[in-house]
Amino acid sequence: MSVPDRKRALEAAIAYIEKQFGAGSIMSLGKHSSAHEISTIKTGALSLDLALGIGGVPKGRIVEIFGPESSGKTTLATHIVANAQKMGGVAAYIDAEHALDPNYAALIGANINDLMISQPDCGEDALSIAELLARSGAVDVIVIDSVAALVPKSELEGEIGDVHVGLQARMMSQALRKLTATLARTNTCAIFINQIREKIGVSFGNPETTTGGRALKFYSSIRIDIRRIGSIKGGENFDIGNRIKVKVAKNKLAPPFRTAEFDILFNEGISSAGCIIDLAVEKNIIDKKGSWFNYQDRKLGQGREAVREELKRNKELFHELERRIYESVQASQVPAAACVDAESREVAEAAK
């Protein structure tokens, strides 16, 4: 078949598909504008936003946050909810664990008056509510907390001790098949918080696994492994927070396996000032000599906590350092997008 014949055959096939399934059911990827644009919601930790490679968690996708107990999973998810609301978006929280503290959520910055919350009785109800909210197209982010607490209805109606092999995994697999397409169509981000379990009898390799089967691992565009690696001491040697390390275990939108560290303080959640300090020191924007931190010709303070308080007071300095960090990151990245012609989408010769 010649090239003109192949082109005519393809055009006829496209015309039949659009007649059968509707206009827009098939199109060129380059002409599909939304394919090039990834809307994101900031996580509240600048170091994590940079590690994700796209500036936050993506809308229209599934994100899984997993880790051990008291590692900051709910705090991170609540910060994402708060940032979505600050952007003018609508957020929903499906609290299957019945453990969301509205006072802590408000302290972090979430608007609890506008935050929709559901505490369903069983897993099927929780996932159906999530799917209906996503289908409405009016919700920007949905948090499901947590996968381990999504109890199938038949298990709920049975006796304690009854064996239900693979019941939750089948429920998750069935729900995610429907949910994935709905999220992409309505540009809604679904965040699943998950717990970890130990595999019995594993001698080699990582014995840890997450609940709910393998479906969530496959359908997630981003998987965030969050761990507590230490405590932060305040006055009189009391703990005032935790040091957190995050690994991007899966990323379909940027290079995976990047890591980030940040502080979670008990009275404010993720410390944005702490992230600025860490990144500014790492990129030699702030000069650290001993316990003193200096910026240009100015002494910011002695000790990390003193500098943190200075940045919380001086918002102008905070935003200046944030801007310089972004400039440093952009300068260090390979400008691949700059080498692509905007109209022809062809790779151009790199500017010398």
From Swiss-Prot:
Q: What is its main location?
A: cytoplasm
What GO terms describe the biological role, i.e. biological process, of this protein?
Answer: DNA recombination; DNA repair; SOS response
Q: Which UniProt keywords apply?
A: ATP-binding, Cytoplasm, DNA damage, DNA recombination, DNA repair, DNA-binding, Nucleotide-binding, SOS response
The entry lists its GO molecular-function terms as: ATP binding; ATP hydrolysis activity; ATP-dependent DNA damage sensor activity; damaged DNA binding; single-stranded DNA binding
Keyword DNA repair attributed: yes
- Record's Gene Ontology CC terms? cytoplasm
What InterPro entries does the entry give?
Answer: AAA+_ATPase (IPR003593), DNA_recomb/repair_RecA (IPR013765), DNA_recomb/repair_RecA_CS (IPR020584), P-loop_NTPase (IPR027417), RecA-like_C (IPR049261), RecA-like_N (IPR049428), RecA_ATP-bd (IPR020588), RecA_C_sf (IPR023400)
Q: Where does ATP bind?
A: G67, P68, E69, S70, S71, G72, K73, T74
Location of the protein in the cell:
Cytoplasm
Which SUPFAM superfamilies does its entry note? P-loop containing nucleoside triphosphate hydrolases, RecA protein, C-terminal domain
Highest taxon of source: Bacteria
What family is this?
Answer: Belongs to the RecA family.
Give the matching PANTHER family: MITOCHONDRIAL DNA REPAIR PROTEIN RECA HOMOLOG-RELATED (PTHR45900:SF1), RECA (PTHR45900)
The task this protein performs is described as:
Can catalyze the hydrolysis of ATP in the presence of single-stranded DNA, the ATP-dependent uptake of single-stranded DNA by duplex DNA, and the ATP-dependent hybridization of homologous single-stranded DNAs. It interacts with LexA causing its activation and leading to its autocatalytic cleavage.
The protein's matches in HAMAP family, at most eight in alphabetical order, are given as:
RecA (MF_00268)
What is the protein name for this chain?
Protein RecA
Can you name the source organism? Chlamydia trachomatis serovar D (strain ATCC VR-885 / DSM 19411 / UW-3/Cx)
